[in-house]
Amino acid sequence: MGIPVHRVSLGDAWSSRMHPDMESERCAQSFSVERLTNILDGGAQHTALRRKVESIIHGNPQFSSKDNYFMSQNELYEAATRKRYHLQKIAQRMGWTEEGRELEYAHRALSADLNLNLQGIFLKALRSLGSEEQIAKWEPLGKTFQIISTYAQTELGHGTYLQGLETEATYDAATQEFVIHSPTVTATKWWPGDLGRSATHALILAQLICSGARRGMHAFIVPVRSLQDHTPLPGITIGDIGPKMGLQHIDNGFLKMDHVRVPRENMLSRFAQVLPDGAYIKLGTAQSNYLGMLVTRVHLLLGAILSPLQKACVIATRYSVIRHQCRLRPSDPEVKILEHQTQQQKLFPQLAMCYAFHFLATGLLEFFQQAYKNILDRDFTLLPELHALSTGTKAMMSDFCTQGAEQCRRACGGHGYSKLSGLPSLVTSVTASCTYEGENTVLYLQVARFLVKSCLQAQGFPGSTSQRSLPRSVSYLALPDLARCPAQTAADFFCPALYTAAWAHVAARLTKDSVHHLQALRQSGADEHEAWNQTTIIHLQAAKAHCYYISVKSFKEALEKLENEPAIQQVLKRLCDLHALHGILTNSGDFLHDGFLSGAQVDMARTAYMDLLPLIRKDAILLTDAFDFTDQCLNSALGCYDGNVYERLFEWAQRSPTNTQENPAYKKYIQPLLQSWRSNL
């Protein structure tokens, strides 16, 4: 079996031959990998376009990541900036725009190994929060990189709690300017990407003060560096925050402002305006100014959050069919480590999660596009549900993708600790997503507030609006309670309706429990804030169950749309079953708590779960192949399509500069140390 034509090889000595163990995995296909790739891409035409973009990117030496693992922080920054420069030139020449998919595919091909990514977030926030006049002025400048912009929200002393941001924007009616000021050291903007060395402008989130009144957080466009010589502008203290756990190519920065003045027109004014005399006009809800962050959060899901787990699964699964270790019987040869049930237990839940989260994120993106159009027209009906879905999905996906990528790394043993495996950089990059665009615990608790309100509405509590129908994502809260799981055999747990209902039951019970505890504290005399703080652990548990239920439900609904693809539907159903059952077994206490599941039924679920592992094993390589990552995109000695792990790992190690550079420590320390011992012999 040869390597498919669309796969751009690394061009090394091993790319032209397939490892026999890898070839055997692809010999008998139970489904069309190409067709599954098309489904994941949203159609064959999108697959073709993506591969065309990838061939352009990988055919250009300016985009090579060959020596990334041996580079210093400065070298990584320069390489990432070089790639952005050449990508922008290609985009201009080819006519690629944000309205098309080419730039999205280019980012995927480059594994987001680029600088100036915050330009896209700036533009999304501008379109969400800016007036038509502001968009007309600033969007062309951003699209063509006449300015380089970042999104500066997080401060040294505040992150997810936006109401606590300290940066102030005080309106001066005499000059019709806003005075942007960092009143304390903790008000210093801290962490924005591209701010440290690159940005010329920043979209600043600050507390608006006009006519002596505080009006909450609003967005302002603030120039920070000269467009002539890139020096900081007056009143601006700016720089790089220093080394980080990962993402070393990005210049995360700090920004302190000392009474910096910007024109009145620099406050984004789709949902709020300050008139020349200082009068404040509110055009949206209190949540409107969070829209820019919501837009960013939704668009991160498939790329920055899910993609690292998908890549980690590809690398670890491919390595697991090449690595032979231990015998199943004393007289047998060593087997592929993927034959071990424990290795399957490590990897297959992560693989199932990749597919579950893909369908969850694409479904959310569809809902977002519908709701976003309404919001821009100042119809905020869908905003609460969209906010809850986006925050919960981001929190759950980033939590599980981080845990899953680390699980894949550990499943590769010692080689997974090598940067050359590609796994450490995947782990550190996705770990960052647990805190950027909202710390996950805080996000879960925002979901919990939505659940409490929805539960009160469903049950007709005083003060609720029970006459209105519940949002679709929480409609299960109004369904009749299913007191007991009807499963009688292990095979019953292969029924999507059964395990989806089980997850709905647990999510509803935990939500009702959280409401009960909250109300009990209120009735005992606690005020609403104290009562909330004393029940946040229970609320957190309910929010997590709700989010997992949504992921199971969305996977089930995606399967129902694949009736014309029976082979693919069958193999994906196994992953859906595994995803649901893995969650049940991991959280079995929640299902046993009220007797919904019996101990015997948990045993049945475990039997069903273990029966799935050998079935998924047969298709594991094919299911990871369907993600269709090129070898350049993976940049892993362990995860190449051809499976030649050991040859490539040995060859890549030879490229380490330390193997050819003189070792100054030898003459300074090692030689004297050896000589001191020799003199005593």
Swiss-Prot record:
Chief location bin: other
Pfam families attached to this UniProt entry: ACOX, ACOX_C_alpha1, Acyl-CoA_ox_N
Residue numbers of Phosphoserine PTMs: S9
Catalysis performed (reactions): (25R)-3alpha,7alpha,12alpha-trihydroxy-5beta-cholestan-26-oyl-CoA + A + H2O = (24R,25R)-3alpha,7alpha,12alpha,24-tetrahydroxy-5beta-cholestan-26-oyl-CoA + AH2; (25S)-3alpha,7alpha,12alpha-trihydroxy-5beta-cholestan-26-oyl-CoA + O2 = (24E)-3alpha,7alpha,12alpha-trihydroxy-5beta-cholest-24-en-26-oyl-CoA + H2O2
EC number: 1.17.99.3
A single GO molecular function term of this UniProt record: fatty acid binding
Signal peptide: none
A GO BP annotation: fatty acid beta-oxidation using acyl-CoA oxidase
Keyword Plastid: no
Needed co-factor(s): FAD
Location in or out of the cell: Peroxisome
Membrane-crossing residue ranges in chain numbering: none
PANTHER family on file: ELECTRON TRANSPORT OXIDOREDUCTASE, PEROXISOMAL ACYL-COENZYME A OXIDASE 2
Stated family: Belongs to the acyl-CoA oxidase family.
Subunit relationships: Homodimer.
Function: Oxidizes the CoA esters of the bile acid intermediates di- and tri-hydroxycholestanoic acids. Capable of oxidizing short as well as long chain 2-methyl branched fatty acids.
Annotated protein name in UniProt: Peroxisomal acyl-coenzyme A oxidase 2
Lineage: Eukaryota, Metazoa, Chordata, Craniata, Vertebrata
